[in-house]
Regions:
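Acidic, glycine/proline-rich low-complexity segments that act as flexible tails and inter-domain linkers
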Residues: 1-19, 26-51, 60-148, 177
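Short, structured motif recognition centered on aromatic/hydrophobic residues
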Residues: 19-27, 55-56, 150-160, 188
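Alpha-solenoid helical repeat scaffolds
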Residues: 31, 163-164
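Short conserved catalytic/interaction loops centered on acidic-Pro-aromatic/His motifs
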Residues: 39, 165-173, 186
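Residue-level detector of family-conserved "landmark" positions at structurally sensitive sites
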Residues: 52-53, 185
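Short, glycine/charged-rich beta-strand-loop motifs at protein surfaces that mediate ligand recognition
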Residues: 144, 157-162, 175
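All-alpha amphipathic helical-bundle segments outside canonical DNA-binding/catalytic cores
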Residues: 149-150, 183
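Alpha-helical oligomerization segments
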Residues: 176-188
Length: 188
């Protein structure tokens, strides 16, 4: 799932579980449902099901809510796992916690570019900056269950498949900042 710019990076094999998650993330972002279902079926016995669910949940940031709903519906069928009874992480009881976690996670991903990112996004619209930090990085990308390195590699796959070049560029750097090697990124 590489584009021209990423293909120049020397790739290295990534472990099987991570490879499945990355492929699922990319598929949700831009492939037909049948292909998403096939990739899920290949992964069902090889990947922690909670990790798959976390990658599906985060896909709503990069693929939209309809694709996320459809992907989770497919995962329920393929995995034969029921939804959890509750998800305390999803409750809006501690909005300040989401904001704090979001700022911390976003700063890891963007590194030295963090302050400039915040200014640029706020310059587009203050609501987008708030949503990026609270919703994107705090509520979603800071959830437990999957480490930030894995999440960022999955974001790279989603951005590559969906042709989101600006976000792809940023998240290639973000994957490095979150601990991925250039070879792992090339393997995506």
């Amino acid at each position: 799932m590489t584009t021209g710019a990423e293909a120049r990076v020397n790739s290295a094999p990534i472990e099987a579980g991570l490879r499945h998650l990355v492929r699922i993330a990319g598929a949700i972002a831009g492939l037909p449902e049948g292909q998403v279902r096939s990739l899920m079926a290949e992964a069902v016995d090889e990947v922690d099901p909670v990790s798959v669910e976390e990658i599906i949940l985060q896909s709503y940031l990069f693929a939209g809510f309809p694709r996320t709903l459809n992907a989770m519906r497919m995962w329920r069928v393929v995995s034969e796992r029921p939804a959890p009874d509750s998800d305390p992480e999803a409750a809006a009881e501690d909005f300040d916690l989401w904001r704090r976690r979001g700022a911390e996670t976003c700063e890891i991903v963007y590194g030295d570019s963090y302050e400039r990112l915040r200014r640029n996004v706020c310059g587009l619209h203050p609501a987008l900056d708030e949503w990026m930090i609270v919703e994107g990085y705090g509520k979603i990308l800071s959830r437990p269950g999957v480490d930030l390195r894995t999440r960022e590699l999955c974001v790279v796959a989603a951005c590559a498949v969906s042709g989101q070049q600006r976000q792809l560029h940023s998240h290639l750097h973000g994957a490095l900042n979150a601990g991925s090697s250039p070879g792992e990124i090339g393997g995506v």
